[in-house]
């Protein structure tokens, strides 16, 4: 029985060696796509974005105009780092905060879009906890400079 459990554990470990990097890459690309598209929409319809931040969104602690600039910049810049897998943990943590802020600031999301934000939050947290994995610039830099 011990031999069977050991073989099972070895098989699972081997499978995870291949599956985990693909999962981490998938989550990075998926979340980056969602947030970049959101930032792109904000910047291409800037007047509407300013209106929404002034009238609809209830961003705490930050003036609405600053929140519009910061939110749009974060949604355009952070996904680039996620795609590259560069400085993944801090960039993912920042993107997680953008996601949390979106949920807090726009209560209308709680009815229909909250599920999506929870899913994105979990995908982002995978990268905060595990890092970007071997399919990333972080891994290449680590191999190059921290042998």
Would you name each region that the model predicts?
Residues 1-44, 62-73, 77, 84-147:
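Extended, low-polarity transmembrane helix blocks
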Residues 45, 49:
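Extracytosolic helix-loop segments that constitute the early lumenal/periplasmic catalytic or substrate-binding loops
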Residues 50-62:
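Perimembrane loop-to-helix junctions flanking transmembrane segments
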